[in-house]
A protein has these predicted regions:
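Extracellular beta-rich ligand/substrate-recognition surface
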Residues: 7-15
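Extreme N-terminal starter segment of soluble prokaryotic enzymes
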Residues: 1-3
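Glycine-rich beta-strand-centered segment in the early N-terminal region that forms part
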Residues: 22-39, 49-92
């Protein structure tokens, strides 16, 4: 069992519930993480309020975190137990532990803390997307990131 922040219905902050959840073994292509830091993002408010629909309810909120790989499922070759990793874009981060698709995981170098990784991964990927895909920044242009 792990503690998680979940919603059983959409709404305001009072919809958040802190409860025990069952965390199973990782399936093929998945990793089991012990999460040590979790990012807080405005998109989490959208899911809580129902502006972005969760795939099902109850739902565990949160889109990014960092932690330590505890176990891996079949066909996982790039990540192994003991690796420090971060990820973004996978709903369910507000939990002590969880399974996540291993191909979403990014190994962390020693000079980036778990807290730093959990606070910057989603924002960094968003900034990269905006300056590489939405508007290709040209030499001489000024941007604010």
């Amino acid at each position: 069992m792990a503690k998680a922040v979940r919603i059983h219905e959409t709404g305001g902050p009072d919809a958040l519930v802190f409860e025990d959840v069952e965390v199973g073994a990782p399936g093929p292509g998945e990793a089991l993480l012990r999460q040590t830091a979790i990012g807080l993002n405005f998109i989490d408010v959208y899911f809580r309020a129902g502006l972005y629909p969760a795939p099902s309810l109850p739902a565990t909120l949160g889109m990014e975190a960092a932690g330590v790989v505890e176990a891996v499922g079949e066909d996982v070759t790039d990540i192994e137990p003991g690796d420090r990793v971060t990820y973004a874009g996978a709903l369910g981060a507000y939990a002590e532990a969880r399974t996540v698709a291993a191909d979403r995981l990014i190994k962390l170098p020693d000079d980036i803390s778990d807290r730093q990784a959990a606070a910057m991964t989603l924002q960094g990927l968003t900034a990269q997307y905006l300056i590489r895909r939405t508007h290709r920044v040209a030499p001489g242009e000024t941007i604010l990131v």
